[in-house]
Amino acid sequence: MLKTLPPTLREKKRYVALEIIYEMELSQKDVISVVRNALLNYSGVLGCSRTNPWLIDYGHPYGILRISREEVDTLRSSLSLMGEHKKKPINIRIIGISNSVKHIREKFLHVPHEPYYKVIQKLKRKGPKK
C-alpha cells in the first residue's frame, strides 16, 4: 500500500481565475484543449507537463484552472499569445491568481464558497440523473 506524500514534499499549486471571450459557448473539453494547445505552442511538451494544467471548475465564460506554482509566468504568456480556436478569434483573460480555490471564488469570481460536503448533499437531494 502506498503512503501519501507529506505536505512539504507535495507539488505547490496555484489557482487561476480565467475569463474566456469567444463567440460561442465552450464545453469543458474545449477549454482544456485550448489551454493545452496554447501551452504546447508556446513552451512545448516539456513546458506543458511542467505547468500541469487542470480545470477545476468551468461555467461559461469563467473558469478555475490549477497549475504548478513555478509555471505561472509560462501560463500567462502562452494564454496571451492564443489568438484563435477553430478559426474564430478567442481571448483568454486572467482575472487573478491565488493559492486557494476559496479565495479565487470569493475575491475574483464573487461567488460564495460552499464546502464540498454541502455540494454533495445538494446533489443527493436532487436524485439520480435520468
Curated annotation (Swiss-Prot):
Protein's cellular compartments: Cytoplasm
Thermal profile of function: Optimum temperature is 36-38 degrees Celsius in the absence of L7Ae, 48-50 degrees Celsius in presence of L7Ae.
Gene3D superfamilies in the record: Ribonuclease P, Pop5 subunit (3.30.70.3250)
Any one GO MF annotation of this record: ribonuclease P activity
EC number: 3.1.26.5
One of the GO biological process terms: tRNA 5'-leader removal
Coiled coil: none
Entry annotated with the keyword tRNA processing: yes
GO cellular component: cytoplasm; ribonuclease P complex
Keyword tags: Cytoplasm, Endonuclease, Hydrolase, Nuclease, tRNA processing
Reactions this protein catalyses: Endonucleolytic cleavage of RNA, removing 5'-extranucleotides from tRNA precursor
Primary localization class, coarse: cytoplasm
Function: Part of ribonuclease P, a protein complex that generates mature tRNA molecules by cleaving their 5'-ends.
Family of this protein: Belongs to the eukaryotic/archaeal RNase P protein component 2 family.
Subunit annotation: Consists of a catalytic RNA component and at least 5 protein subunits.
Record PANTHER family: RIBONUCLEASE P PROTEIN SUBUNIT P14, RIBONUCLEASE P_MRP PROTEIN SUBUNIT POP5
Protein name (record): Ribonuclease P protein component 2
Organism: Methanococcus maripaludis (strain DSM 14266 / JCM 13030 / NBRC 101832 / S2 / LL)
Name of the gene encoding the protein in the UniProt record: rnp2
